[in-house]
Amino acid sequence: MKLEHPDRLMNRTPLSLAALETHDAFAERHIGPDAASQQAMLDTLGFASRAALIDAVIPASIRRAETLPLGPFAQPKSEAEALAALRALADKNQVFRSYIGQGYHDTHTPAVILRNVLENPAWYTAYTPYQPEISQGRLEALLNFQQMVADLTGLAISNASLLDEATAAAEAMTLLQRTGKPKSNVFYVADDVLPQTLEVIRTRALPIGIEVKTGPAADAAQANAFGVLLQYPGVNGDVRDYRALTDAIHAAGGHVVVAADLLALTVLTPPGEWGADVAIGNTQRFGVPMGFGGPHAAYLAVRDEFKRQMPGRLVGVTVDAQGKPALRLALQTREQHIRREKATSNVCTAQALLAIMASMYAVYHGPHGLKTIALRVNRIAALLAAGVKQLGFATVNDTFFDTLTIDTGARTAQVHEFAKAKRINLRRVSDTQVGVSVDETTTRDDLADLLDVFAQAAGGTAPAVDALDAGLAGVAALPAGLERTSAYLTHHVFNRHHSETEMLRYLRSLSDKDLALDRSMIPLGSCTMKLNATSEMLPVTWPEFGGIHPFAPAEQTVGYREMIDQLEQMLVAATGYAAVSLQPNAGSQGEYAGLLIIHAYHASRGEGHRDVCLIPASAHGTNPASAHMAGMKVVVVACDAQGNVDIADLKAKAEQHSANLAAIMITYPSTHGVFEQNVREICEIVHAHGGQVYVDGANMNAMVGLTAPGQFGGDVSHLNLHKTFCIPHGGGGPGVGPVAVGAHLAKFLPNQRSTGYARAEDGIGAVSAAPYGSASILPISWMYIAMMGAKNLTAATETAILNANYIAKRLAPHYPVLYSGPGGLVAHECILDLRPIKESSGISVDDVAKRLMDYGFHAPTMSFPVPGTLMVEPTESESQEELDRFIAAMIAIREEIRAVEEGRADREDNPLRHAPHTAAVVTANEWPHAYSREQAAYPVASLGTNKYWPPVGRADNAYGDRNLFCSCVPMSDYA
């Protein structure tokens, strides 16, 4: 029901309970414009109702006839009800003490980081820092991450995170394939690499013709491989000296990738010092909860010669217009949105928020604190080794950092039974061996419990921890010559913020530099920067979700899996497909998985030769990049003057490639913000030639409840839960990219055979390290759908379309709207054409984007899908007041441009060419411009009470790429 004023309710008799219940209250807080505002906007558009507008926008041939079939979630829950229902599911999980290891460890998240980063909307609602001037805070935090990784690995340069350790390993493999031994297609994986990593590597290698060989690390030099992956320490805990082996691999013409534990590298010689070419790994144990598998920030570091081949984001140092240091994303020409099928990777969203947490963990503890944690972990492992030996058990590995593999023989089942009684999980290595990985949360009481488990199995008495500690003067746990001697984290940022006061102020100083959703609307087209409600975010930090290991026994994860099953069914209802997998931990990975599923389907029918993928010229860069990674040949389909798929060209290309046609990849609504009228015909043409239809779900926010790709001809789609379903963007991740498929493709959904969470045997290989990907943020989308219900999800979609059309209508007299459908209407976003302005005034789309910062706004999406344009997506969460504020800013900027066109302002010395204007520039003694300081900083009256100041002037991108520097800069540079 609609909330009404209490005075009006008091005049009713009798007051029923139903009249006072507010199940729809959350929807009214999520959807920005109230009823009066919506009607005012509809009046502007010339429609009597929202329903009439939607009838005019969406083709009748694809309209959904029924209400979203959400079953028990059809009716909205209040925030309290939804939290209680989710709490009931969380309580079904059992949080055991986890010593499983295998790349995931329990950790303490410092409270100051938990509250002021993970739970702070200034950090989690920000977008990827493509506009560097308003992203300096998170860019600095990510630069700290890069410095941390480079220091600890001993390599020259690190990227700003990848999706997980297994994905990073696969990316390292393809990096070396591009740069390594030209006559070899072999990638050699040592047999003590994490099993989930090997599984993802196999998935990624198969479609691009890489042969994966496994075996003892010692045999790697004889494998004739272009690359070798070593684990340091190994999955069984061994710490091996790989110096001679690395030299031998190099002598044979190969390169070496090392999967390294960053905490171990505080005490072990780093890979870069013994010849590694690439290091990869996971930063999860630096303060990020296990979360049933994610999200966590992986890392990839390389020798200097490989820096231009690195996948993922890279933060670099440059200068601004005033010559002061500024940070920006560097070497963007490597990325999929520019190079398309020639990109180094299809990764877009990575794990920025988690990388920031990990970097702040290092800032908080500093080098001394990290080493103390590492030495304590190693000491506990040594005491455990000594204790189990006293009890008659042998350790398989004599060298170790934190992990022991213990030979338990016929008593293995007893060991697990006694451990279970103490709510302890050990790794099930085999029927005769168990693994124990300790971590920073392991206390002396925990150690005593572990010893007691083995004592019970041995029929003896556990040795006392204090006695073991007193009797163990030293232990040869690390190989001779592998103890680290080099310094790390020497930069001042890791050595000055160790009191909570200093740490708190540092975090605040960084967040104050950035413009996120907590300050203003972010109207990025194709990005769906909607509300990330607090009640949706709360469960992320519940220990019942955060404290679960991804490979915990199934009986301990009942609540998690029930929640996941429910969310999958919610997404099935929204998409019209038959089945969903939540394993892909980014949209790019869901897209990749979808293409592999299509290939598996064709292969199952004896048509594995089908490898041609049709992609419209207007498609997002991830589409061709993913198709290339999936082993497909990209054939571009032309678009007509209105931006729609050229049907004649599609028919010709489909006919030409009929025998080998695998798929078409389309986005709907299209990337130009319109519901194409002939989408059913497009699907039918491709199906007639034996192909499958991949519908990119990036624009699903315009479809939920109104139409569904699974109902108008799609066979497979990926979704972006960090767009449509309210997971925040986190400044560049985390994301979740579920893949949804029709019934005929369901059995091919991603598997993970190396764990106890396998799906259908015909499933493609794993695309993420954990069976459910970034599981700990799935409650966000569950909460959103549960609190909205079927009717309000549809209303949200309708309002997103209303808001976009309102902006288009209001701005059309000032900026041409490039594409529209019948009646001049758009879908959930609109493209403003600035190319005529460039011709008439010399003002570029970049100038307008930077000038918007002076008005307190993040720019819309620049030059996509058409160069020289801005794509605006307001989402349903923005109020009419905020839309009007943005419209006023855009109109004011158009008047500033008009002054240039008419000669009233200089073509170079004008507010747009010199934007953004910092406080330092505006208050300087010298003011060299013809326009006033007031026009520079306060061009509209509303800024007088709510002014955001960009911390740096316009970043010099060309300088940054010419003088690539991707490490922390000295304090003197900020003076």
From Swiss-Prot:
Domain of life: Bacteria
Top-level EC class as recorded in UniProt: oxidoreductase
Keywords assigned by UniProt, alphabetized: Oxidoreductase, Pyridoxal phosphate
Reactions accelerated catalytically: N(6)-[(R)-lipoyl]-L-lysyl-[glycine-cleavage complex H protein] + glycine + H(+) = N(6)-[(R)-S(8)-aminomethyldihydrolipoyl]-L-lysyl-[glycine-cleavage complex H protein] + CO2
Cofactor(s) named in the record: pyridoxal 5'-phosphate
Residues in coiled coil: none
Purpose of the protein: The glycine cleavage system catalyzes the degradation of glycine. The P protein binds the alpha-amino group of glycine through its pyridoxal phosphate cofactor; CO(2) is released and the remaining methylamine moiety is then transferred to the lipoamide cofactor of the H protein.
Family according to the record: Belongs to the GcvP family.
Name of protein: Glycine dehydrogenase (decarboxylating)
